[in-house]
Amino acid sequence: MRSTHFHTRHLTGLVCTLLCVACMLLSCANPGSGPDGGPYDETPPRIVQMLPALGNTGERARKVTIAFDEPVKIDNASEKVIVSPPQINMPEIKTSGRRISVELMDSLKPGTTYTIDFSDAITDCTENNPLGNFTYYFSTGTQLDTMEVAGHVLAAENLEPVKGIMVGLHSNMADSAFTTLPFDRVARTDANGHFCIKGVAPGNYHIYALKDVDGDFKYTRGEMLAFSSETVVPSSFPDVRHDTLWADTIRIDTIKTVNYTHFMPDNLVLRAFTEKNNTRQLLKSQREPAYFRTYFTAPSAHVPVVRGLNFDAAHGIVEDRSAGNDTITYWLADTALVKQDSLMVAYTYEATNDSTLQPYLQTDTLCLVPQFSYERRQRLAAEDLAKWQKGLEKRHKRGDFSQEKPPVKPLKMQLALRGSINPDENMHITLDEPAARIDTTKFHLYLKVDTTYKAVPFKLRRDAHTLLAYTLYGEWRPGQQYLLNIDSTAVTGLSGAVCNNFDTKFSVAGDDSYGSLFMTIAGADSTCVVQLLQGDKVAKQVRVKNGRADFYYTRPTDYYVRAFIDANGNNRWDTGCYAEGRQPEMVYYYPHKITVRANWDIEQTWQLDALPLNRQKPAELVKQKGDTKNTPRNLNAERERKKRGG
């Protein structure tokens, strides 16, 4: 009996194994398995049933079920499937074999058209054949709203397509709707920044884009946004388009004329930006022996007031403020204060109320203490001196009497020089502390003439926005060599430190090392700033003058060109502010690469708005590349073409 039972189990296992092998062989011969097992499956899934029916009116059911003729899947449902009106509670989207179900968790609104836009997310499970752009829709009222609004969202600063940002419509035309009410209708941008809002009712709307971090479909400070002051009025008209049917990847089979409804507007461009943080608070304070520094979270025109509680601040400090007063350094002009370990300060500055954003004056008491006390700094200095003296004794034993005085810490100067400069550049000098005195008679600039150096004129000026930076202006001659000599003690710092003797030789590149680019900017005035780009880096920047942007002494290489409208004249691009209704400054790209050659002059005309913004940025500069769309692939025709070619 045990032997019979063993053989029965053995035969049963063998039969199961053979059945599995047979199934595998059959599957290999099944359509969709590849070139060795018959033709590819190129048929997209077909909808066989929708419950409730597509386009139902007066609908009350919150669950939608769609049945197909084959197993299907949804690609990236969280990004591609969009329900409108927006749902506060996330819809539940499920796939099970040949069925897809979507259950809305929010209560249905009366008299409203609902759309579930699947985009190209639905494919079959064998060859990923896409159903195509599919939108399910129904209405809780007596009619369906079918209008559409489409366009692109671009980053305002660099015209990059913004992927995955929400775009919404408000029928409430008040500016406050964006911050207090969820959108009426929504869509989401694809990788090209394109959006299409469906199921829109006739009427007037304001349109917005929103990177909705907190998921409430309303703008919250700090989120990326875009807005338009224009009123959006959806409309439509009958139109004709020509669809191309391909025999394979290179041959056209048929060009088909298709009548369709053309919805407008379909070319909106929203420029997305993040507002500057205008909430001003004191971020931190820092004390070094020779100075103390304060950092703020935002700029302000107000200059903080320092009142010394244990020292005389009126005569003991020198202020070095950044352009927006967001970083301020207070240099200690009195050496007694440098030695004082603790400085107590009543510090009055402009802060911002977090809720109302209104400025007010805040006074804090700051206790400013350096990392190392004066006593410890003196002890470390004494240790360094002892080491030097030991070294001195060793040098004396070797008969070396060249360094008889202890080293004194000099005033440091940094010169931004690469060995050569452009004829249109100047030399920049940076100090490590403010200068108490500069003797320009101890600065010497020489031009090399044959084998000797001849003194030439120059000007030395302190930069407007810092006490530490200076620019030396010279009348540079292309192709010539120069020598800059700065005598010791030419510059004396606030601490009494003096600079060392300084010599540097440099050359000015010749005219034949450069090219020139002259751009005529149609319709542009002096608010337009034009930039030469190497990738993302700005190589040169000029302001338009008399309708032209002229780039002299330009190094030979490939460039791209960007322009922005500098509305406030600060020479840099500025973001927008929704509360003030201020758009970010306009940005444009010249759509082609420009190659500058040595000893060549290039003339180029550019009309800033010749192309829509979404088509301006050269493809080589676009970082946000488009997704690979789920499109029919015609694999069988392609395989036959390869066979014929082989």
Model segments located where?
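N-terminal targeting or signal-anchor segments and their processing/structural boundaries
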Residues: 2-646
